[in-house]
From Swiss-Prot:
Annotated family: Belongs to the complex I 23 kDa subunit family.
Binding site for [4Fe-4S] cluster 1: 130, 133, 136, 179
Name of the protein in question: NADH dehydrogenase [ubiquinone] iron-sulfur protein 8, mitochondrial
Pfam families referenced in this protein's UniProt entry, alphabetically: Fer4_7
Subcellular location(s) of the protein: Mitochondrion inner membrane
Transit peptide, UniProt annotation: 1-41
Species of provenance: Solanum tuberosum (Potato)
PANTHER family: NADH DEHYDROGENASE [UBIQUINONE] IRON-SULFUR PROTEIN 8, MITOCHONDRIAL, NADH DEHYDROGENASE UBIQUINONE IRON-SULFUR PROTEIN 8, MITOCHONDRIAL
Main location (coarse class): mitochondrion
Cofactor annotation remark: Binds 2 [4Fe-4S] clusters per subunit.
Molecular function as annotated in GO: 4 iron, 4 sulfur cluster binding; metal ion binding; NADH dehydrogenase (ubiquinone) activity
Length: 229
């Protein structure tokens, strides 16, 4: 609609210019000169016709865009369409399965590779797995592990001291990867916050206690990951 009005206004403007030019020439040289002047004026100014058309059409497009934006804003304001779209999205997710977990009463599943609180494991006979090779102590980047060992009567080596400073540990899992007998592992527990620093200094008894508590779960996790180690 705006484009049609623009073209009509342009045609009216051209006609008026031609008429004014014809009247000016007629006053001096008569009717024949009027026609000649009209044709000359039209010929002289014909080069600007295409340019004017382009300008008018561009203006019409801009006006059309402006009116469309005004119309859209008016509709949104009048009928509150944005709020309706938001409510529709809310209703869509209202009936879908909830993804929120009400922690700590609900807990999500943990990966078998989860690295949590440390533990020392035993064999089924009750014998400690650790052979005091000190590979875990050597590989620990945080230097959080301290081991002391001695030789037993049968010639085997066993630890007399196995300490982990949990405030230094970065839970990289290198100790577990380095252990040749799967003695030191990182268990599934992540809720071991304490009120004092001393409670985070784990000794051998504490680590063995953790291993006895989670042995079933730890063994299952190691079994499921055995193909990828």
């Amino acid at each position: 609609m705006a484009a049609i009005l623009a073209r009509k206004s342009l045609s009216a403007l051209r006609s008026r210019q031609l008429v004014l030019a014809g009247h000016t020439i007629e006053g001096t040289n008569g009717y024949n000169r009027t026609l000649l002047g009209t044709r000359s004026f039209a010929t002289k100014h014909s080069f600007s016709t295409d340019k004017d058309d382009e300008e008018r059409e561009q203006l019409a497009k801009e006006l059309s865009k402006d009116w469309n934006s005004v119309f859209e804003r008016s509709i949104n304001t009048l009928f509150l369409t944005e709020m309706v779209r938001g409510l529709m999205l809310t209703l869509k997710y209202f009936f879908e399965k909830k993804v929120t977990i009400n922690y700590p009463f609900e807990k999500g599943p943990l990966s078998p590779r989860f690295r949590g609180e440390h533990a020392l494991r035993r064999y089924a006979t009750g014998e400690e797995r650790c052979i005091a090779c000190k590979l875990c102590e050597a590989i620990c980047p945080a230097q959080a592990i301290t081991i002391e060992a001695e030789e037993r009567e049968d010639g085997s080596r066993r630890t007399t001291r196995y300490d982990i400073d949990m405030t230094k540990c970065i839970y990289c899992g290198f100790c577990q990867e380095a252990c040749p007998v799967d003695a030191i592992v990182e268990g599934p527990n992540f809720e071991f916050a304490t009120e004092t620093h001393e409670e985070l200094l784990y000794d051998k008894e504490k680590l063995l206690e953790n291993g006895d508590r989670w042995e079933t779960e730890i063994a299952e996790n190691l079994r499921s990951e055995s193909l990828y180690r």
